[in-house]
């Protein structure tokens, strides 16, 4: 019989839950007061692509600031301040340039997903008024998740944070994850 040196594997049974990696969860918030129009992502669980439009948004403040920018002398302090406010409120540089080229303010702006992922929380409905800072969506990247396991005290010496594990989920196909 051949003898070989190998790492001893000791199975540990524990109950736990799968949770989102908190470093891969992104909040999408309203940056300015306004109304939700054309809600495109309608429920938690929906997959989204990075830069996909989640909803379209109408804001009197955005509209007024666009008009300020169009009326201001190009390159002046007023134009620079208006352009910066529009960027801070979520209007893309491309949309600002396009609005200036057309010399017509955009009635609505799109709010895009910051990542490719899954909507894990949707807090907005079509037609709703939202205030600056209000949470609209929470989106998670499912490419890496956490397993939060409740390990018995006698098994603690055999477990380390960040250790690679094989997880079997009861009720699933029985294949390890």
Set out the residue ranges of the language-model regions.
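Periplasmic scaffold and linker elements that assemble and bridge Gram-negative envelope complexes
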Residues: 1-177
């Amino acid at each position: 019989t051949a003898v070989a040196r190998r790492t001893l594997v000791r199975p540990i049974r524990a109950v736990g839950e799968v949770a989102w990696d908190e470093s891969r969860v992104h909040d999408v918030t309203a940056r300015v007061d306004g109304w939700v129009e054309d809600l495109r992502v309608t429920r938690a669980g929906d997959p989204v692509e990075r830069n996909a439009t989640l909803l379209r948004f109408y804001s009197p403040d955005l509209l007024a600031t666009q008009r300020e920018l169009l009326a201001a002398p190009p390159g002046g302090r007023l134009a620079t301040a208006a352009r910066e406010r529009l960027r801070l409120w979520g209007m893309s540089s491309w949309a600002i340039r396009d609005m200036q080229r057309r010399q017509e303010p955009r009635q609505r702006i799109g709010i895009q997903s910051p990542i490719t992922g899954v909507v894990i929380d949707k807090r907005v409905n079509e037609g709703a008024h939202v205030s600056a800072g209000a949470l609209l969506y929470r989106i998670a990247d499912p490419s890496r998740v956490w397993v939060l396991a409740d390990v018995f005290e006698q098994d603690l010496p055999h477990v380390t944070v960040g250790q690679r594990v094989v997880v079997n989920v009861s009720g699933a196909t029985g294949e390890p994850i």
